[in-house]
Design a protein with these regions (language model features):
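N-terminal targeting signals for export/organelle localization
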Residues: 1-45, 183
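A short beta-strand-turn-helix
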Residues: 38-40, 45-66, 89
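Active-site acidic short loop of glycosyltransferases
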Residues: 61-64, 94, 120
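Aromatic-flanked redox-active Cys/Sec active sites in thiol-based oxidoreductases
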Residues: 69-74, 104
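C-type cytochrome heme c attachment motif
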Residues: 73-80, 143-146
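Structural microenvironment flanking redox-active thiols in thiol-disulfide oxidoreductases
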Residues: 79-118, 128-135
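Thiol/disulfide oxidoreductase modules built on the thioredoxin-like
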Residues: 115-119, 126-175
Length: 183
């Protein structure tokens, strides 16, 4: 190999290594403010099934902060964040916070998952419309998990694609709980 080609190859490798280093050290994506393609009333009225087959909607949590998490049993980041959501549900439930997980999978599979992993907050099944609702709430990539936080007036205020860090969610819920105390 000639010296010219060696120099070019070393330069190219340096550029690739620098790019990889920059991408690896990039801070995690912050939750985005939601600009949904759907009205809050439509989201609150959307029908889901609980694990016993009953009809449910987010509208039943009127006056509460709702953390809506789109997930699947096969999704590794979903499984990783669920224990944190379980802890946060226990911590903030008395302050009017309600976590709800929604999956497009079949009820028996979700029920088995809930029992196996000890998930006690509501897990609902939404069927084929779940991916479209998630997209309309800001999930342009169509990936899981996708979390949307609604304020007490049922307006979506924050959404995040990917696992939601426990400390970030805890800070957000503390702010939302403080707002409700002041009112």
């Amino acid at each position: 190999m000639s010296a010219k080609w060696q120099f070019t190859l070393v330069g190219l490798l340096a550029v690739l290594a620098g790019t990889a280093l920059l991408l690896a050290n990039r801070p995690p994506e912050a939750p985005a403010q939601v600009a949904p393609d759907v009205s809050p009333a439509v989201v609150m009225a959307a029908g889901f099934r609980d694990l016993q087959g009953g009809r449910r909607s987010l509208g039943e949590f009127q006056g509460k902060v709702v953390v809506l998490n789109f997930w699947a049993t096969w999704c590794a980041p979903c499984r990783e964040e669920m224990p944190a959501f379980e802890r946060l549900q226990a911590k903030w439930k008395a302050r009017g916070v309600q976590f709800v997980g929604v999956s497009a999978e079949e009820g028996p599979k979700v029920l088995e998952f809930a029992k196996r992993f000890g998930v006690t907050y509501p897990l609902w099944v939404g069927g084929d419309e779940v991916p479209e609702l998630s997209r309309r709430l800001g999930n342009r990539q169509g990936v899981l998990p996708h979390t949307v936080v609604f304020d007490r007036q049922q307006a979506p205020i924050v959404e995040r694609v990917g696992a939601y860090p426990e400390d970030s969610m805890d800070s957000l819920l503390a702010k939302l709980a403080a707002i409700s105390i002041e009112k």
